[in-house]
Swiss-Prot record:
Zn(2+) binds at C13, C16, C35, C38. GO terms for biological process: cell division; proteolysis involved in protein catabolic process. Component of the ClpX-ClpP complex. Forms a hexameric ring that, in the presence of ATP, binds to fourteen ClpP subunits assembled into a disk-like structure with a central cavity, resembling the structure of eukaryotic proteasomes. This is ATP-dependent Clp protease ATP-binding subunit ClpX.
């Protein structure tokens, strides 16, 4: 049986064994003690088990400023996009509340959103964070895997199935969820003229998405459809589902320039060109999306267009360190669990950001770069009890030397000579 106190007579948590001096709070029960850390862990386990249990009270939707503030805890920069999303989401759920509480003479339409920005600029993260703020079911789909009904590939209805599964098959909750469709630019028509032949992965997908974006009662096969043709279908009304579509839309800047009648100057620094492209990107209008290859009906169902900027070196360094779920904080915590302190030199973070820019992966590529740097460290440290600190230097970030380990006696050695 677990002892409730140690040799010095200090009370201990009955679950983890920590003394009252090692925790903030020790709660007493009949013959048992539990610390605040174990309480928090239990809460997390219960939340995971229950999944989505309580959803937003649509009468108390956070105001746009509150939404933007919470988004800023997780997403660095992109202020224009955060404002546009905050307003669109607030209006969307205000509309739902208005429709549910009383009969309206004026019918309020849906404000589906189109996010335009380079790879790794934060489109998916913004959509995920919005769903987390509102505590609503959330699903992600890749437009490139979709085909219209009757062709090999994923049916549009499968997107709705993912949302229903996210809501633990509670259709009523799923009907107020958020769906993010990525790579929507990849299903653009290849030219402005309608295709003579069937376009299975392009215009056909846009046509298939039209009804669910606008609002319809869709029949969704609970097991995914084609492999189980005789299953009972789930009916779901998509009228109150918020759809966010996103894509890089490579080359749309040129379309904007042509529309504005401005000539492209063939010289200048990469930095200047980047700033110029961002300026044009912020001026995208529905006409440009039409030229790019989206069909008019599809564009009409995306009234809100928000653009994201290419992340520069400073923004990527901030992403590494500042958000609540920043990668540097995560890796520090992982090593902390092995009683080892992790330090990234400021110049090392700059090198990591430069590498992400070089790879053209944006924030999305940061984790794989750090994983590569940290591989030997995370392999070595769990088997050693004489290491107190790990230092990632600028050269280590560039791959020119190994990360440095500080031992208990204060000496610092490269990781490969530590075995």
């Amino acid at each position: 049986m677990f002892k409730f106190n140690d040799e010095k007579g200090q009370l201990k948590c009955s679950f983890c064994g920590k003394t009252q001096d090692q925790v903030r709070k020790l709660v007493a029960g009949p013959g048992v003690y539990i610390c605040d850390e174990c309480i928090e862990l239990c809460n997390e386990i219960i939340e995971e088990e229950l999944g989505i249990s309580e959803f937003v009270d649509f009468g108390e939707v956070p105001k746009p400023q509150e939404i933007r503030h919470i988004l800023s805890d997780y997403v660095i920069g992109q202020e224009r996009a955060k404002k546009a999303l905050a307003v669109a989401v607030y209006n969307h759920y205000k509309r739902i509340n208005s429709n549910e509480t009383k009969e309206e003479e004026v019918e309020l339409s849906k404000s589906n959103i189109c996010l335009i920005g380079p790879t790794g600029s934060g489109k998916t993260l913004l959509a995920q964070t919005l769903a987390r703020i509102l505590n609503v079911p959330f699903a992600i789909a890749d437009a490139t895997s979709l085909t219209e009904a009757g062709y090999v590939g994923e049916d549009v209805e499968n997107i709705l199935l993912k949302l229903i599964q996210s809501a633990d098959y509670d259709v009523e909750k799923a009907e107020k969820g958020i769906i993010y469709i990525d790579e929507i630019d990849k299903v653009a028509r290849k030219s402005e003229n309608p295709s003579i032949t069937r376009d299975v992965s392009g215009e056909g997908v846009q046509q298939a998405l039209l009804k669910i974006l606008e609002g319809t009662v869709a029949s969704v096969p609970p097991q995914g459809g084609r492999k189980h043709p005789h299953q009972e279908l789930i009916q779901i009304d998509t009228g109150n589902i918020l759809f966010i579509v996103g894509g890089a839309f490579d080359g749309i800047e040129q379309i904007v320039k042509n529309r504005m009648g401005e000539k492209v100057i063939g010289f200048g620094t990469d930095n200047a060109k980047l700033k110029e492209d961002e300026t044009y990107l912020s001026r995208v209008v529905p006409e440009d999306l039409l030229k790019f290859g989206l069909i008019p009906e599809f564009i009409g169902r995306l009234p809100v267009i928000a653009t994201l900027e290419q992340l520069d070196e400073a923004a990527l360094v901030s992403i590494l360190t500042e958000p609540k779920n920043a990668l540097v904080k995560q890796y520090k915590r992982m090593l902390e669990l092995d009683d080892v302190e992790l330090e990234f030199e400021p110049t090392a973070l700059i090198e990591i950001a430069k590498e992400a820019i070089e790879r053209k992966t944006g924030a999305r590529g940061l984790r794989s770069i750090i994983e590569q740097i940290m591989l030997e460290v995370m392999f070595e440290i769990p088997s050693r009890d004489d290491i107190t600190k790990c230092i990632i230097t600028e050269k280590a970030a560039r791959g020119e030397e190994e990360p440095q380990l500080q031992l208990e006696d204060g000496s610092i050695i490269p990781i490969k000579t530590s075995a």
